[in-house]
Amino acid sequence: MTRKSPYPTRADYPALIENAKPALRKLLEAASYERRIAVLNECSLDVVNTVCTIMVLGRHSLYLRRKKPINAPDAVFVRWAADLWTLREQDKAGDIRYLCGKTDLREYLSQGLQLLRIDLTEGGTYARETR
């Protein structure tokens, strides 16, 4: 008997992204940090993880392309991103605060979605198969 991994597979991503679209729209419309946190608090854990994954991919890509300065908060971001996949329901509004306060949220999300689309169509490595 094979046990299903608790982590999303590549095949899961189209549905997860589709389910996250309303939250993504609300996040992009949110004018304040507090509203962004409120939007995420209204979401299911799957949606939060999908949104965060998109942000992480976008942020990491921009960092690698050196479009953003290297500074101390980047180390915090890397630690935060590493823990996303084990995010628990009660922690939803905690560590997410770092990213939701960023002013370039739109750029992170658009870059992350672009990477996932490429990954899903070309068999890349961004969408996790298993852990």
Residue spans for each PLM region:
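Amphipathic alpha-helical segments within well-ordered protein domains
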Residues: 36-40, 53, 97
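Short coil/turn segments at secondary-structure boundaries
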Residues: 53-54, 66, 124-125
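Short, hydrophobic/amphipathic alpha-helical patches that form generic packing surfaces
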Residues: 49-59
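Helix-rich interaction surfaces within compact, conserved domain-sized segments
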Residues: 79-131
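Mid-chain, well-packed structural core segment of small domains
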Residues: 62-90
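Beta-sandwich interaction modules
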Residues: 38, 60-63, 100, 117
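Structural motif
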Residues: 38-48
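General marker for long, soluble alpha-helical cores
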Residues: 3-10, 17-24, 29-33, 37, ...
